[in-house]
């Protein structure tokens, strides 16, 4: 019964997160952004993406930093990070009692951020400007746990990874 109760608790948390996220998507103003749907919401949230949706706050949408934010979220969508997160949520429901699965989730999100940052930098955006954007966004609001977005706690590591010399694998 304890296993079942824990699994139901994790499932309820995930469903609540989905509900809140889809409320934002449903109530936001829709705009087209390439092959994705851009949702602009009035709530002061950190930008995130899920499926084909990129969700940004009105303040982020109206600032000059919009390009960097949208490019970052587009990279998450392009690399299909939503599928990874969805699989991880299913594993969390089944193996909620195992601390390793929670660590794996955190590491997966960190790798997603590294991949998105690398994708942004590969487009030719100014690295210093992008890093300043990350620092600026790090003082923002809490993220939705089900979605990709700017990860506050790993910011220094992300910037360090961006500054590393890239060497050829071969």
What residue ranges belong to the model's regions?
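Membrane-embedded and juxtamembrane structural elements of multi-pass membrane proteins
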Residues: 1-170
